[in-house]
Amino acid sequence: MPLPYRSLTSLVVRYNGHEMMIDCGEGTQTSIRQQGMIGFKQIDVICFTHFHADHISGLPGLLLTIGNAERTEPLLMVGPKRLEKVVDSLRVIAPELPFDIEFKELSETEESFEWQDLRVDAFRVNHNVTCYGYSLTLPRTGKFSVDRARENEIPMKYWNGLQKGNTFEKNGHVYTPDMVLGPDRKGLKLTYCTDTRPTPLIEKYAAGSDLFICEGMYGEKEKAVKAVEHKHMMMQEAAAIAAQADVGEMWLTHYSPSMTKPAVFMDEVRSIFPRAIAAKDRMTTTLKFNDEE
């Protein structure tokens, strides 16, 4: 449940002027307005991990606000089976919108789709209802070689297009990206999961993530039995996954309402994975390519 200083679950990813939201708990709109950097009209995709109220109850009001922001482009929603039925039931108070809603219902253990230049992988986790985690990957091509472009006598007007992966043909000559680009470099990766016990798929998709956002429902060791019973994750378990997956940084989130001071447990958590942070509402970061690569 929400607390006066802690709203319910939602994450917004911004890329190239477009936004994807994952989950939309009660109070999401308020947090967005307080944060001040996110535009409602720019939300193109809303993904849901599962259909418990703390992850979806903020949707009706958000849809009305997106409509009031004069969005007319279709909005994509992604989530487990029955997504369209669940959303339709919530739209009783938001029946008329100036944009269409498209649905992608997940049914497989692992599925993927494209958004902008990113690949989005959805993977099933282990909760007491069907629940998915999401991993977003932005690939990065190899370095452009001016010397190779000149050796292959490629007209300069094609250089920019080749860097973007395009192929060109002129006077019987075909120019392809591999003629001027080195090996692919490490891209950017963000992985998000919540409401789950530890599973091999979480480690698989978190592997190499620049940022791993993971549930840390409980920190007290005496709550471990409760975590297993209700299929949630201990902070220490999340840290172990982060260490095994060799992530750049981990943000813990989705705390139990009984946990008023998550920071109390961070010394123990960091003894397992040093680059762990107890996340707070409206935290932001910018993921950047490593220019040395």
Q: Which sequence ranges carry the predicted segments?
A:
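Conserved beta-strand hairpin/beta-sheet module of binuclear metal-dependent hydrolase folds
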Residues: 1-38, 74, 134-136, 182-193, ...
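Active-site-proximal loop/helix segment associated with metal-binding centers of metalloenzymes
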Residues: 3-5, 116-192, 196-205, 211-213
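Short, surface-exposed connector motifs at secondary-structure boundaries
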Residues: 16, 69-74, 244-251
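Active-site neighborhood of phospho(di)ester-bond hydrolases with catalytic His/Asp-centered motifs
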Residues: 22-25, 43-52, 80, 191-196, ...
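Active-site metal-binding motif and surrounding structural segment of the metallo-beta-lactamase
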Residues: 27-78, 102-107
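Metal-dependent catalytic neighborhoods of phosphoester/phosphodiester hydrolases
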Residues: 58-65, 87-90, 260-268
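A gly/proline- and charged-residue-enriched helix-loop-helix capping module
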Residues: 85-94, 103-108
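Binuclear metal-ion centers of metallo-dependent hydrolases, dominated by the metallo-beta-lactamase
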Residues: 109-110, 199-293
